[in-house]
Amino acid sequence: VSGQTFEHQNEDGTWNELFARGVNIGSSLPGKWFTEFVRSEQLFIDWFEKISAMGANTIRVYTLLAPEFYSALQYYNASCAEQPLLLYQEIWPEENPIDGDYLAPEYEEEYKQEIRHVIDAMHGRAVIPERDFRAYGLYTSDISPYIAGYLVGRELEPEEVIRTDERNPG
């Protein structure tokens, strides 16, 4: 951030002002559960072509997606794009902490592990074991040059905040 604008560092180390025109991409196809991750590189490449054609230059994803998404983004940006698509990568915490306490040490450690998984995946250095309701697999595509930013957290419901506050007075 410079003044009131975003800047993005190019691969050669120079900085350009970035006016983000973006698109959100979910984890699944319409009509599927959000935990049924898309695993087609070609489908993502097709989407990236359409996203670029409509004038967008950034993509936001709500959570770590399947490895195929990042492979497709690396391929598209390196091979197809006149201008690369940049990524806002959200790091989604577990939704149901034990006893509803977002400040519990176990919950905090789980979230820190998720942050490590996501950052390692963005650098193409992650092997994430199979897990329920989350993306997993071998992440070998280094898309770190295309990261516009990390979005840490998610919206919390008022009831969740109240429960956490009740368990952590002061």
Where in this protein do the model-derived segments appear?
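Active-site-adjacent substrate/metal-binding segments within catalytic domains
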Residues: 1-78
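Active-site region of glycoside hydrolase catalytic domains
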Residues: 60, 78, 82-170
